[in-house]
Amino acid sequence: MHTHYEEPLWQHYEFICGIDEVGRGPLAGPVVAAAVVFPRWFQPTEALLTLLNDSKKLSAKERESLVPAIKAQALHWALAEVQHNVIDEVNILQATMLAMNNAVKALPIIPSLLLVDGNRFTTDLAIPYKTIVKGDSHVFSIAAASVLAKVHRDALMCVYATHYPHYGFERHAGYPTSAHIEAIRQHGRCPIHRQSFKLRQLGEKV
């Protein structure tokens, strides 16, 4: 992947920020967002960065190898987490918006333009933005944000797995696999589970 999408925009915007999130679907843990700004007119000359794509299309090893390259080449990057209890309070959509906005606010600069993966974004920031469906497959800065968010969240869930070993978080990162649902059936929910995410498989009213 290259910066073909950003190139015409750089004529008008100096600091273009790609934003993506991971963790909307899991039954446990936080939603994590990343914001990445590459230098104006950046071209990925490092061979590793040309492999950059939607994090879901990369292996865990590929994602992890990309993280130091992204951080080294980016002008700025930031991560933000919104925890399970906040997700239960405000709903997953609002929690996702909060995470993405907080990632932008954590940057040391004010971006000129936000490029957001997906088709929906709300913000109180006075920054123009574009939503891009499948942006993590087409836009370099969004793909970079996707990788940073995914690797960060997977690492968090591996830490949680040591505290709550019955659930296999290190294998499924909290997503509703059959093994995860069976673990909830046997052991109940643990403190990092999203209480508002109900399961038909357990006879819960959705």
UniProtKB/Swiss-Prot annotation:
SUPFAM superfamilies referenced in this protein's UniProt entry, alphabetically: Ribonuclease H-like
Names of required cofactors: Mn(2+); Mg(2+)
Pfam families according to UniProt: RNase_HII
Residues binding a divalent metal cation, per UniProt: 20-21, 117
UniProt GO BP: DNA replication, removal of RNA primer; mismatch repair
Broadest EC class assigned to this enzyme: hydrolase
Residue ranges of domain RNase H type-2 in the record: 14-206
Domain of life: Bacteria
The keyword Nuclease is annotated on this UniProt entry: yes
The enzyme's E.C. designation: 3.1.26.4
InterPro entries found in the cross-reference section: RNase_HII (IPR022898), RNase_HII/HIII (IPR001352), RNase_HII/HIII_dom (IPR024567), RNaseH-like_sf (IPR012337), RNaseH_sf (IPR036397)
Catalytic activity: Endonucleolytic cleavage to 5'-phosphomonoester
Record's signal peptide: none
Coiled-coil portions: none
Any Gene Ontology CC annotation: ribonuclease H2 complex
Record key words, sorted: Cytoplasm, Endonuclease, Hydrolase, Manganese, Metal-binding, Nuclease
Cystine residue pairs: none
Chief location of this protein within or outside the cell: cytoplasm
Compartment(s): Cytoplasm
Function: Endonuclease that specifically degrades the RNA of RNA-DNA hybrids.
HAMAP family: RNase_HII_B (MF_00052_B)
Family in the record: Belongs to the RNase HII family.
Protein name: Ribonuclease HII
